[in-house]
Amino acid sequence: MSTTRGVSSSSAAAALALLLLFALCFFSFHSAAAARAVPRDEHQENGGVKAVAAVAADQLVLQLEGDTGNGDEVSELMGAAEEEAAACEEGKNNDECVQRRLLSDAHLDYIYTQHKNKP
């Protein structure tokens, strides 16, 4: 009778190990399938360092192609923002300026209120 109990416990341990292996495989494949690929742009096929912005439903995906940057990307972005601000002060593209300001204000409001406790 002791041999039956030993076989029973070893088969239960094997079944438990098989179940854990199955669960591990399921979750690893499920997480890989849940990840979505970044959209490709037709200009990326040439190579080099290129920035591609793709606007999704609620997010902005910025993809840089190449090994490393030289740090001038942020400076270039800041320069573009300063040029847009100067154009707004001169009165050019008034509708675009108002729309940009409203969007930036709404975005800041969202950032500062998203983690606050609601009454």
From Swiss-Prot:
Q: Where is the signal peptide?
A: 1-34
Q: Name one GO biological process term.
A: cell differentiation
Q: Which GO terms describe its molecular function?
A: growth factor activity
PTM comment: Sulfation is important for activity and for the binding to a putative membrane receptor.
* Sulfotyrosine: residues carrying this PTM: Y110, Y112
InterPro entries xref list: Phytosulfokine
Key words, A-Z: Developmental protein, Differentiation, Growth factor, Secreted, Signal, Sulfation
What is the top-level taxon of the source organism? Eukaryota
Task: Tell me the compartments it is located in.
Answer: Secreted
Main location per the UniProt record: secreted
Please list the residues that make up the propeptide.
35-109, 115-119
GO cellular component terms, A-Z? extracellular region
Q: What does this protein do?
A: Promotes plant cell differentiation, organogenesis and somatic embryogenesis as well as cell proliferation.
Q: Which family does it belong to?
A: Belongs to the phytosulfokine family.
For this entry, the protein name equals Phytosulfokines 2
Q: Taxonomic classification, please?
A: Eukaryota, Viridiplantae, Streptophyta, Embryophyta, Tracheophyta
